[in-house]
A protein has these predicted regions:
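Short amphipathic alpha-helical segment within the helicase RecA-like ATPase core
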Residues: 1-264
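A generic structural signal for tightly packed, nonpolar segments enriched in small/aliphatic residues
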Residues: 1-2, 59, 200-494
Length: 494
């Protein structure tokens, strides 16, 4: 059970609708003529036919139309969920529509629901069942841990009707993947006084006991022994010392390892370069990259994917006090390069500098880092698309394809040599902030300086996608878990 839904796949038969109190019909325009083949109850089929004949906007993606119909078994709620038309009839539309439907079912206090879609009459379209299942689980997410009188929706048993033989397996996969995204969301939505670097350690260790993951933790003593002065500098002003966490998963024998490295700044005040107080509380989400990696490793291990992956969480809290790093300080990262601290609020790239270096020491032959790195990415790409800076176009295409399967959008920015010049310092090797111009690019290129030469590397900036300001589709206001599903899908492609 996930988010009050108990979901199973079932064949398309008239008997499947018996005893249900709700039916959700997922419709794209091209598939609408096949509605009679769904063996809906007679009253429902007539209502659908009449409504479709009179309304053209029913197919708009995410649009919901609800009826309460009298039937022989009593009152029944019918929800028609629009999924697009023409070439726009993609799995992600069904995922979004299912997210909307999940909240409608919760609101109606549904107990027994059936989800049907003409497109699932095609035995080759099981992946649409997976998309619908993901949407139901993600759209039904709630975070009410701190509500004194939290109200849970009743448990709703859902049958997802499909003629595809692989639907049952894909629905199981969807539940594991969605649980991982919700795990990420929970971490992100908790406040900074709850989630600290040590709490991230405890979450990783708990996963290591439950799943085939080898967990290694570097505390401040071990970080110093390994020369990781960049992450230590970021955490110096906090009473919660930094931690570097590694989770190793071996599902492919001697195959090379890919590393996912996440920024885990559990609260970012900006340090001495302190942020404005407006919305500073939102900086509890500055550990989303690390949460993404932890959630992805959870699903990868649960699914038993045939790949070798190392997850690295570079965790620290960025606070101002008498011991905190100062603008103008120069620190030496683990790979020996020196960093001039222009702004203590450009701390994410510093923890990742040691994080990607550590991933290389653990044997990674491909490195992907993910971080709420900049506000500049919001100006460049908005809140629906994450930016990529990379040294390998093949890896970028893999990420984009994984994102397509996950319903998450990415755009590559140019890693020009001129931009790399911008991160050079007059008094040290590198600047931790090169100013406003090309901020997404220069931030990414800074991190790339700490990846072993010749290794494929990509940086993902989720600064604009890590949280949602409103609930729509699969997104629920708060932490989105953007990136978790992409990393899982990518691991399945390795």
């Amino acid at each position: 059970m996930l988010n009050q839904f108990e979901l199973c796949s079932a064949p398309v038969t008239a008997a499947a609708y018996e005893k249900c109190d709700s039916i959700v019909l997922f419709l794209c325009k091209e598939c609408a003529p096949a509605v009679p083949q769904l063996e809906l109850p007679v009253e429902v089929e007539k209502a659908v036919e009449a409504y479709l004949a009179a309304h053209d906007d029913v197919y708009d993606v995410g649009a919901l139309t609800s009826f309460v119909l009298p039937t022989e078994g009593g009152l029944l709620q019918l929800i028609i969920a629009g999924c697009g038309e023409g070439s726009d009839c993609k799995p992600n539309n069904f995922r979004k529509a299912a997210g909307e439907a999940a909240r409608a079912l919760h609101k109606a206090k549904a107990r027994q629901a059936v989800c049907a879609a003409p497109i699932l009459l095609n035995p080759q379209r099981g992946f649409y069942a997976q998309a619908i299942a993901e949407g139901l689980f993600l759209g039904g997410y709630t975070f009410n841990r701190f509500k004194s009188e939290a109200k849970e929706a009743p448990l709703c048993a859902v049958k997802l009707l499909s003629s595809a033989e692989d639907s049952a397996k894909l629905v199981e996969v969807a539940e594991i993947e969605a649980e991982a995204v919700c795990f990420t969301r929970d971490l992100v939505n908790n406040p900074g006084n709850i989630v600290t670097p040590q709490v991230m350690v405890e979450a990783a260790l708990a996963m290591g006991k439950e799943l085939p993951l080898e967990v290694t933790v570097l505390d401040e003593v071990l970080l110093k022994d390994r020369g990781m002065e960049a992450i230590l500098a970021v955490g110096r002003g906090s009473e919660n010392p930094p931690r570097m966490i590694a989770l190793q998963y071996n599902g492919a024998g001697d195959a090379p390892y890919t590393a996912f490295v996440g920024k885990g700044v559990t609260f970012d005040s900006g340090g001495i370069s302190i942020k404005p107080d407006d919305n500073m509380g939102e900086m509890k989400d500055d550990m989303t990259g690390a949460a993404d990696v932890l959630g992805a490793m959870r699903a990868i291990a649960r699914l038993g994917l045939p790949c070798n992956v190392i997850g690295v969480l570079a965790c620290a809290e960025n606070m101002p006090d008498g011991r905190a790093q100062r603008p103008g300080d120069i620190v030496r990262a683990a790979n020996g390069k020196t960093i001039e601290v222009v702004s203590t609020d450009a701390e994410g790239r510093m923890v990742l500098a040691d994080g990607v270096w550590y991933a290389c020491r653990l044997g990674a032959k491909k490195v992907i880092d993910i971080a709420t790195l900049t506000g500049a990415v919001i100006i460049a790409l908005g809140n629906e698309t994450s930016g990529i800076v990379a040294n390998n176009d093949e890896l970028v295409e893999q990420l984009k394809l994984a994102g397509k399967y996950a319903g998450e959008n990415y755009w590559q920015l140019p890693a020009l040599p001129e931009c790399k010049e911008a991160v050079k310092s007059d008094v040290a090797d590198l600047l931790n902030s090169a100013g406003r111009a090309g901020g997404v690019i220069t931030g990414g290129l800074f991190i790339g300086e700490f990846v072993d030469k010749g290794l494929p590397w990509a940086h993902i900036d989720i600064g604009g996608t890590s949280t949602a300001t409103k609930t729509e589709g699969v997104k629920v206001k708060g932490g989105t878990g953007f990136g978790t599903l992409t990393l899982i899908k990518l691991a399945g492609m390795l």
